[in-house]
Amino acid sequence: MRTLSSVLLLLATAVVAAPTHGATLRDLSLTLPDGRAIAYGLSLPDGGETTPRPLVLALHPGGERMPRYGSWFARNIVMQAIAPLNAIVVAPDCPAQRWSDADADAMVMQLLQKVMAEHNVDRRRVLVVGFSMGGGGAWSFSSQHPDLFTGAIPMAAMVGSEPVEKLATMPTYVIHSRADSVVPFGPAETNARKLEQLGRPIRFEALDDLPHFSMGGYVPSLQRAVQWVTERWKQ
């Protein structure tokens, strides 16, 4: 497994010339009623919230973690790709071993309830985006909470134990590289094709020559994914 420093180096070389998102992301923390705390980044849209805004939940990958990993992932990968949405962005640090853990699910849902109560969120446009472990979280959250999320973009991720009837019930854009040696390409493609055959609103984009840790190389595909989901929302 690569160290975090090597991952950051790979990412930096890939995104150094990429445009940045105009909004500011603040590092915050929420203490829950049971005393546990969850760190998160929050970005509010340019121009205020006089009209309802989309909300994007950004889920960072696993591996060696650093404080405020959620904010780092949002700033360097997600925000530049979703800039056209002018969305509210919520980027938590995973409070458990995996995003699909019950504790992580419960804590993130409480965080989203707070954000949605305090800000003008368009409930018809709530997107979850994640990479690797975070992509698994995108599959998990979208299948467990179809009443909340209306779009999902899992990148370089595998599906967990979610039953197939719960997957891709909303616009879902899957991105995976054939050169991924950490999360195999084959099962991801097979799963997406099965869901296509079931008539689910899913799109699968295959990338070439991108190692698993080259997150920055996924940004152009993420931009296309956001555009595709946005078009589905308009239908």
Roles of regions detected by a PLM:
Residues 116-118, 124-169:
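Primarily recognizes the serine-hydrolase "nucleophile elbow" in alpha/beta-hydrolase
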Residues 85, 167-172, 198-200:
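Short, proline-enriched alpha-helix->beta-strand connector loops that line the catalytic pocket
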Residues 55, 59-116:
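Active-site machinery of serine-nucleophile hydrolases
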